[in-house]
Amino acid sequence: MVLDSKIVRRYFTWALDTTRESHLRTLSDGPLFKGIGKKLLRKLLIDLIEKKYMAGDIIFHEGESGKALYVVLDGSVKIVKKSSSDSRTLYVLGPGSHFGELALIGHTLRPATAVVENDALLLIMYQSYFDDLIRCNSPISARILLNLAKRLSDYIQLHQPE
């Protein structure tokens, strides 16, 4: 059987478009990219890095210098805080969730370790790309900063002593 190259190309283009649209929905449903139009999100998807991780992979260690923010497109990642005697899971993050944002806004050391719980596909935004967005006064950067500020505000309110 001989396959028509046009049909094969069309199938792979369709599969790629379907995957991109799925990722686009995941991003638009997540808190980091809330309020950013689909056209701008499509551009962002092209510019950012996708990387697959296997269960058990460590994305970063507590105490490391951070250079990127991550968005879970598929799978799950747990954020673990180590103490002198053991470690405890702070969060388990699924599709649409993001982590590592302190690297972009605070240039701080990682406060916890990120471990892949189930095989995961992550979208990575490096510090240099984020800095470029801000320098360009991009509408994407303004919205991301507002969304990060909201997340920080929610976190502070949730953890205030009563």
Residue ranges, per PLM feature:
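Cytosolic regulatory regions built on CNB/CRP/Popeye-like sensor folds
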Residues: 1-162
